Amino acid sequence: SVAFKAGVKEYKLTYYTPDYETKDTDILAAFRVTPQPGVPPEEAGAAVAAESSTGTWTTVWTDGLTSLDRYKGRCYHIEPVAGEESQFIAYVAYPLDLFEEGSVTNMFTSIVGNVFGFKALRALRLEDLRIPPAYSKTFQGPPHGIQVERDKLNKYGRPLLGCTIKPKLGLSAKNYGRAVYECLRGGLDFTKDDENVNSQPFMRWRDRFLFCAEAIYKAQAETGEIKGHYLNATAGTCEEMMKRAIFARELGVPIVMHDYLTGGFTANTSLAHYCRDNGLLLHIHRAMHAVIDRQKNHGMHFRVLAKALRMSGGDHIHAGTVVGKLEGEREITLGFVDLLRDDYIEKDRSRGIYFTQDWVSLPGVLPVASGGIHVWHMPALTEIFGDDSVLQFGGGTLGHPWGNAPGAVANRVALEACVQARNEGRDLAREGNEIIREAAKWSPELAAACEVWKEIKFEFPAMDTL
């Protein structure tokens, strides 16, 4: 037998395996690697594979007590990034046994927990993950999914409409409830707590829940439609979060909300399990995502966070607008929107999808378009996102010159007009403005909204390019 050979050896001798055939059960990752000058890409890719699986900086005696071949991550392919001098895409395969079942927390701790501070790399970005069915099947996934949500709400054949209540901080619970009522009464399906509304001195959570529940029931009785308000259950401890979710269920409201990145995946998964068991829909806000996903060469792409959310659980998630005030490049946004909604997504590098992803039968998540959108955007949004989406107009509802309810009316009229035009076979991309103008002729509320926002544009070149 060979004696134990101490010392430091190059990662690529063990962890760079270009001949490796990936298994159907492997978790595959695509990293954008920017090595330090003088570090060959193979070594950098192998270093990532090693440090995010079984390796450490030196050979250890206890390596002899396990089978590295069975457990090590492998960098199995490296390709240069077109148009970038020193960037490479490194593909890494991880054996399934490295991960705890049903834990997004553990998956991220393993894959991205340690390697991002690595000295041999100037920068590192996780672009995409392939989650094998063998792993995704250990998760509950979204509490209900798209079809069940439509059945609960009895709303079919169109996108859903929402509105974030503004000013986001400072309203009393009673005035907050009033704004909720006016929006729902005007024709919206949902209103939403802002992500930073938790339980502050000016409005404690229990007061808000009570007033919002009253607003929901009153609006439902008057419109004959099912209404909802995303009650933000995010809290400082998991116990407090569950307490809020339980109170929401006792009030009989249809939906609660959670900030899944700031709240953490462990808390989110617990809440998702509770929501399925108790018939609550779960709206997910992605506060803090840009800290992780905005840099092009470091961090994680949002499509990875979106996949993680589908596993951890949520029925809605914010996913950019393509047209409003926040970032989002069209093809790339549509790429992860499909990853949220569809069962099977083909690899398509033009949309940033590095791997074919088969979700089997995991329920889908509704993408939420929100941020700086208004009635003039409605045709584009209807065309880009299709029926299975939630369109959220915060300022685009509450900023209406006549008040909240007319603002809601304007949005609902615009949406119904766009859906009808599309169903009649008209081209929303080309005739969008015309469709809105026609509808405005018989809806004074819409006409007023059109007048206010006719000049507003948030035009900056998008940063998320391929």
Swiss-Prot record:
This is Ribulose bisphosphate carboxylase large chain. It comes from Betula nigra. RuBisCO catalyzes two reactions: the carboxylation of D-ribulose 1,5-bisphosphate, the primary event in carbon dioxide fixation, as well as the oxidative fragmentation of the pentose substrate in the photorespiration process. Both reactions occur simultaneously and in competition at the same active site. Substrate binds at N114, T164, K168, R286, H318, S370. Its main location: plastid. It holds the Pfam family RuBisCO_large_N. Heterohexadecamer of 8 large chains and 8 small chains; disulfide-linked. The disulfide link is formed within the large subunit homodimers. Keywords: Calvin cycle, Carbon dioxide fixation, Chloroplast, Disulfide bond, Lyase, Magnesium, Metal-binding, Methylation, Monooxygenase, Oxidoreductase, Photorespiration, Photosynthesis, Plastid. The basic functional RuBisCO is composed of a large chain homodimer in a 'head-to-tail' conformation. In form I RuBisCO this homodimer is arranged in a barrel-like tetramer with the small subunits forming a tetrameric 'cap' on each end of the 'barrel'. Mg(2+) binds at K192, D194, E195. One of its GO terms (biological process) is photorespiration. Its EC number is 4.1.1.39. The disulfide bond which can form in the large chain dimeric partners within the hexadecamer appears to be associated with oxidative stress and protein turnover. One of its GO terms (cellular component) is chloroplast. The active site is at K166 (proton acceptor), H285 (proton acceptor). Belongs to the RuBisCO large chain family. Type I subfamily. Its cofactor is Mg(2+). NCBIfam families: PRK04208.1 (NF003252). GO terms for molecular function: magnesium ion binding; monooxygenase activity; ribulose-bisphosphate carboxylase activity.
